Curated annotation (Swiss-Prot):
FAD binds at residues 58-67. Pfam families: Pyr_redox_2, Pyr_redox_dim. Maintains high levels of reduced glutathione in the cytosol. Disulfide bonds join 67-72. This is Probable glutathione reductase 2. Its EC number is 1.8.1.7.
Length: 503
């Protein structure tokens, strides 16, 4: 049907032959951009297709995908704004006088403007890069005609159609936030809308227990907003439970309230407020903003994957692909969050896209190693991790076959202001309980956790033992040294709190 609607007087063969490429990439997020740019560097003629379906509240954005526009970048900038505000409160302890704590107020509009100016600058940088690399960019929606032919519909008012073909097609369309199937769900927003709100969110209910929900709760609370998080199951599934406990307990000290054992039944508009009715004995409460952060769904609805023979997981809807990123039909590939059983991390998508292009256009055999990938949750006290959690290690090796070294510590920058956050800072190493003492996982809760874990992730990747850690001379004083100072095991029952400073 689509073929017949486009210039019927032109032969189909001519339409396709005039728009042939070596590679078509659908989706200009982190994975799609990485794959496109690498392929172009290797001499491929590349078509990159990307369009953003506006949110139910009308917000859309430029090239770069979730991370650059409504994910990692704006989120981390707002996290940094929260850190700056906290440091101001401790400045007088370090001799910085004249800061009137009563006059310190946060201006949401200033932050939002500056954050989104940075986002738009990134959009422009991406467009310049595509132009420099002679990548053919189409601001359009894509749909498969068959596995190597794509019909695109432009975002212009005429919705201009065109046809493209290539022997290699990469799908990298990512995920979008999920709206619940309840009355009034449309009255809520998602993280796709949060960073461009015209005014401060006010009293906010965040529904979800994953990293998006908790990170948003953290920085909004720091901006003096009344924040409640509804956690329907366990928070931060897949992360080490000891670490999650300290993150959650600390989050509560910042003023974030945590609702458990209830769900949202419906949302109603009451003037400018949102009246939320909870299940069971949860009652009814009014909020200024409701944020849905309980899961994400594949951004695939317009692609018509059946025409290409691309199989998806029946439960998640994600694309099934092998370790070489090959989908279920020859010539179609998938990278990034859209792939089943892959961690939803920007750096993984970038690496996957790059190595896929290498395999397609430079005879490379290298594939991504999905084990031992480090990640960070940017809650007020950050949580970083690489490798197995204690729970995963027990499940895989047995409780008697692993050893857990751990410590509570006080970050040096917390000493002078006597920052009470130190009571939640924690470090853990999980290793085998044999002569090798091979490190299975490293976990850190504290300030600058991402900066701490990155170097250890390199060491973890090449394989290190507990003795390697303990025989490493520390940099002192810093939080990172807590890993190399570890010596108390959980099994011993000794007090894991660090004592003293330089001895």
């Amino acid at each position: 049907m689509l073929l017949s609607t486009f210039k019927r007087h032109l032969p189909i063969r001519r339409l396709f032959s005039s728009n042939k490429f070596d590679l078509i990439v659908i989706g200009a997020g982190s994975g799609g951009l990485s794959c496109s740019k690498r392929a172009a560097d290797l001499g491929a003629n590349v078509a990159l297709i990307d369009a953003v379906e506006p949110t139910p509240h009308g917000h859309s954005w430029g090239i770069g995908g979730t991370c650059a526009n409504v994910g990692c970048i704006p989120k981390k900038l707002m996290h940094q704004a929260a850190i700056v505000g906290k440091e101001l409160k401790h400045a007088d302890k370090y001799g910085w006088n004249g800061i009137d704590q009563e006059k310190i107020k946060h201006d949401w509009n200033v932050l939002s403007k500056n954050v989104n100016d940075r986002v738009k600058a990134n959009n422009w940088i991406y467009r310049v890069q595509l132009n420099q690399k002679k990548i053919n960019y189409f601001n359009a929606y894509a749909e498969f005609v068959d596995k190597d032919k794509i019909v695109i519909t432009g975002t212009d008012k005429n919705k201009t159609k065109n046809f493209l073909s290539a022997p290699n097609v990469v799908i990298s369309t990512g995920l979008r936030p999920k709206y619940p199937n309840i009355p009034g769900a449309e009255l809520g927003i998602t993280s796709d809308d949060l960073f461009t709100l015209a005014s401060v969110p006010g009293k906010t209910l965040i529904v979800g227990g994953g990293y998006v929900a908790l990170e948003c709760a953290g920085f909004l609370s720091a901006f003096n907003q009344n924040v409640e998080v509804l956690v329907r199951s366990i928070p931060l599934k897949g992360f080490d439970r000891d670490c999650v406990h300290f993150v959650m307990e600390h989050l509560k000290t910042t003023g974030v309230k945590v609702k458990e054992h209830v769900e949202v039944e419906r949302v109603e508009a009451v003037g400018s407020k949102k009246k939320v009715t909870f299940t069971g004995n949860g009652g009814v409460e009014e909020y200024d903003t409701v944020i849905w952060a309980a899961g994400r769904v594949p951004n695939l609805k317009s692609l018509n994957l059946d025409n290409a023979g691309v199989r998806t997981d029946k439960r998640s809807g994600k694309i099934l692909a092998d370790e070489f990123d090959r989908a279920s039909c020859n010539g179609v590939y998938a990278v990034g969050d859209i792939v089943q059983d892959r961690q939803e991390l920007t750096p993984l998508a970038i690496q996957s896209g790059k190595l896929l292009a290498d395999r397609l256009f430079s005879n490379s055999k290298q594939i991504v190693r999905f084990d031992g990938v480090a990640t960070t949750v940017f809650t007020p006290l950050e949580l970083s991790t690489v490798g197995l959690t204690e729970e995963e290690a027990i499940q895989k090796h047995g409780e008697d076959s692993i050893e857990v070294f751990h410590s509570h510590f006080t970050p040096f920058e917390y000493v002078v202001p006597q920052n009470k956050d130190s009571g939640f800072c924690y470090v853990k190493a999980v290793c085998t309980r044999d002569e090798s003492q091979k490190i299975l996982g490293l976990h850190f809760v504290g300030p600058n956790a991402a900066e701490v874990i990155q170097g250890y992730a390199v060491a973890f990747r090449v394989g290190i033992s507990m003795s390697d850690l303990q025989n490493t001379i520390a940099i002192h004083p810093c939080s990172s040294e807590e890993f190399v100072k570890l010596h108390i095991t959980k099994r011993s029952g000794q007090d894991p709190r660090t004592q003293g400073c330089c001895g």
